[in-house]
Amino acid sequence: VVIVILAIALTAVTQMIGQNTISGAYTYDETKAIELAQSYLGEIKAKRYDENSPVGGVPPCDGVSGGNGCTANSNAALGPDTGELARTAFDDVDDYDDLDEGSGSGNALLDAEGNTRTGYENFRVQVQVTYSGNVAPRSGSVSDSKKVVLTITQPNGEALDFTFHRANY
């Protein structure tokens, strides 16, 4: 009788440990994904709103040609500017549009200085930038805000989305 009770107890403990090991691995990957997202978001948030925005964002580009006008007011115009092929050359938020690095992308996962990231094997980073419309009260211009969606795909295939808006200020 004691052997049967002991066998049942050991089976239950073994299953519990197995489940904790599996969930612990997922938690570890999620933590690494969040660290990776924080790194990319910090890098992107530090950039200017637009190619024609001054460093610091004041005064904002105003969407008119010449002077301090924004470069374009359409989603088709977003993405790296001419000559900005490497992330180290990106100088405004929309340069990151369509960035795709890491596992399955064909591009290495890099840090802000262009060095290959270690410890993030099988992670993938994708960035989409779009105009988010008039979310700022100063005008009806489509160029008031850009929406940045950062997607981190973990080794298990689960994707985490991180979103922020960059205002034209």
Sequence positions of predicted segments:
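Low-complexity, Gly/Pro-rich coil/beta segments used as flexible assembly/activation regions
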Residues: I34-Y169
